[in-house]
Amino acid sequence: MTRAAEGDEERQTHRVDAGGEGASGPRAHGVAKIAGVERLPEHQARVRVSYDAVTDAYVERVHDELSHKPLDRALLTAFAEQVQDQFGAGASVCDAGCGPGHVAAFLAALGLTVTGIDLSPAMVTRATALHPDLSFEVGSMTALSAADGRWQGAIAFYSIIHLTSDEEIRAALSEFHRTIANHGLLLVAVHLGEHGDATVHADEMLGVPVALEFRFFDLEWLAGEIAAAGFQVEARLVRTPYPGVEVQTTRGYVLARRVGEHVAA
């Protein structure tokens, strides 16, 4: 649902800093329509419960994190500029795994029309209160409720880290491809593993008991999966963590453009 916290909004890390699995309403993978989700896969239900529980601490930790992350701001700004160059001012984008809405608000300030989606109802409630002029909804990124081609772009900013199976990653990428218009952009940010792909369990985050798995990615593998889902990868970037600002993990980013016809995962 959300992103992951710590001094940064991301979510993963050894013990825990915060993380989430964002997304939108349901459609595939047996996720019932969310205004009141009747059923979620067990691990997604744990993500939801965990982020509902940690909402207050998480918001306190990440609400101003972008002010300390110049490269993240630069990438989000480049994303916003390219989407609007392609589709015009006010183009519609999705922030999947939006958490308390601070990244959505940053994009909106750059001229985009943003819909934030998160698995946690508590996070969506808080995002709506903090940013009443923006649109937020509860949902899962592996089963988006949006119509085909609904958005001109989407971001998953440190929000796919709770998708611990390759099948879920492919389902989310398939949903992004379905809901992004042709030639629209996808920007994904993740934590990278020191020795490739790895998953870490956390039972505490920001002093709150949780039950979460955080995935650390191999960037080349992720870029390959994004390409296989029907996107043309335009940029890959790796950065070291900002000392004293965020969890001390290496960060990876993929910027890709939607091409081709949709093929279900």
Predicted regions and their residues:
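Class I SAM-dependent methyltransferase SAM/SAH-binding core
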Residues: 92-143
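Conserved class I S-adenosyl-L-methionine
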Residues: 30, 34-88, 185-213
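A short glycine-rich, Lys/Arg-flanked "PGG" loop and its adjoining helix->strand segment in the class I
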Residues: 170-182
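Conserved S-adenosyl-L-methionine
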Residues: 231-242
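Short alpha-helix
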Residues: 214-229
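A conserved beta-strand element that flanks and buttresses the S-adenosyl-L-methionine
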Residues: 155-156
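Core SAM-dependent methyltransferase catalytic element
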Residues: 244-265
